[in-house]
């Protein structure tokens, strides 16, 4: 029983009017038994496992305070970016373990993980974080070294004679 559609209004009224995945009901938070949201963030070679829960804004990285682990203010600002974008500064405690890569990659992985964990804890924050580009994994990684070259793109020094 195929229904003929003559206008866009008929298309809206059809049986499949609402696209899949776009339901009007709010999403439910993904929490563990202890009431924490868990997410994994990645950047370059670094991987961050992040747990967030409501608290006073304390961030623990590998058992150390944020200011001790990330001494550079730029990295600390980068890590706190998801909270400032959604106006949740000092409302969540973060406990995370970071491994691999350098400090900059680890800070990027931590920012990615915090953003994902925030969306799991409060799904309503997803559009703001997505618009800021914090939920997208940065695909840039180190280019591999090629044979016949000194590095990925640099050639060996040329000697005319």
From Swiss-Prot:
GO cellular component, one term: cytosolic small ribosomal subunit
Keyword field contains Ribonucleoprotein: yes
TM region positions: none
Region described as Disordered: spans on this chain: 1-38
Keywords: Ribonucleoprotein, Ribosomal protein
Record-linked Pfam families: Ribosomal_S9
GO biological-process terms attached to the record: translation
InterPro entries: Ribosomal_Su5_D2-typ_SF, Ribosomal_uS9, Ribosomal_uS9_bac/plastid, Ribosomal_uS9_CS, Ribsml_uS5_D2-typ_fold_subgr
Residue ranges, compositional bias (Basic and acidic residues): 27-38
Matching NCBIfam families: PRK00132.1
HAMAP family the UniProt entry points to: Ribosomal_uS9_B
PANTHER family hit by this protein: RIBOSOMAL PROTEIN S9, SMALL RIBOSOMAL SUBUNIT PROTEIN US9M
Similarity comment text for this entry: Belongs to the universal ribosomal protein uS9 family.
Full protein name: Small ribosomal subunit protein uS9
